[in-house]
Design a protein with these regions (language model features):
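N-terminal accessory regions of S-adenosyl-L-methionine
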Residues: 1-46, 149-153, 157-159, 164, ...
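Short, solvent-exposed loop/turn segments at secondary-structure junctions
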Residues: 53-57, 79-80, 113-114, 140-142, ...
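Conserved acidic residues
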Residues: 45, 105, 132
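Class I SAM-dependent methyltransferase core
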Residues: 49
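Conserved beta-strand signature within the Rossmann-like core of class I S-adenosyl-L-methionine
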Residues: 130-144
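Class I SAM-dependent methyltransferase SAM/SAH-binding core
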Residues: 52-98
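A short SAM/SAH-binding and catalytic strip from SAM-dependent methyltransferases
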Residues: 105-119
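Class I S-adenosylmethionine-dependent transferase superfamily signal
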Residues: 126
Length: 215
């Protein structure tokens, strides 16, 4: 689908060839806005894709801004990192946290921060690796209740498994982010949330764009 002029309404993780999904179109075009903002007045951009699977956003980024040279770095579990490196030998893949030893123009975590048991530690590490912008998106958020843990079964997105993830209270999340010297630039609604059985409140999936406060 990326080789055509069809809409960006595709799921990077799904085998479906549908290109008119409004939710996925919103996710990718929102990312395009962030990528354009981070690359202003730049011919080359360094990007860390935290939890980026096999590197789908390497190709998506190239299609969104074709003349931008992207120094792409992706962190995920070993199986995905190894396969991604085979697919994209010019990119950089990691199965550990050694990618956090440097800074990036854009740090991007889409649908991944909530799976860190100690999400505060991960957020702090991502903030410290950010020189330009930090974009946390597809994050389950609640407003009136405390953060809680839920079980996710993402079969429709191509993952034949289930796992635990956080649903974070928005005020708590933003307070922790501010404590790491992150300035909130913009909030986004990223996607429709699946129903969570027996939850104290149903989550909404939000995105948050930050910039580090220069000290």
């Amino acid at each position: 689908n990326l080789e055509t002029t069809l809409p960006f309404g595709i799921s990077p993780e799904s085998s479906s060839e549908e290109s008119a999904n409004i939710m996925f179109h919103n996710i990718i075009i929102t990312y395009g806005y962030v990528l354009a903002l981070a690359s202003r007045q730049k011919s080359e951009l360094s990007l860390l894709d935290w939890g980026g699977g096999i590197g789908h956003y390497y190709l998506i980024s190239q299609k969104l801004i074709p003349d931008l040279i992207i120094d792409y770095h992706c962190k995920d579990v070993p199986t995905l990192a190894e396969y991604g490196q085979e697919l994209f030998p010019k990119a950089h893949f990691y199965s550990d946290e050694s990618c956090l030893s440097r800074k990036f123009d854009l740090v991007f975590a889409s649908g991944s921060l909530q799976y860190s048991q100690n999400w505060q530690h991960t957020l702090k590490a991502l903030a410290e690796a950010t020189s330009g912008y930090l974009f946390i998106t597809r994050l389950p958020i609640v407003h009136q209740v405390a953060s809680y843990v839920m079980v996710q079964r993402p079969y429709e997105y191509g993952y034949n498994t289930e796992y635990l993830g956080w649903c974070l209270n928005k005020d708590e999340f933003l307070s922790i982010a501010a404590s790491f010297n992150l300035r909130l630039i913009r909030e986004f609604i990223s996607q429709v949330s699946p129903y969570v059985n027996n939850a104290p409140a149903q989550p909404q999936y939000w995105g948050f764009l930050f910039a580090p406060i220069k000290i």
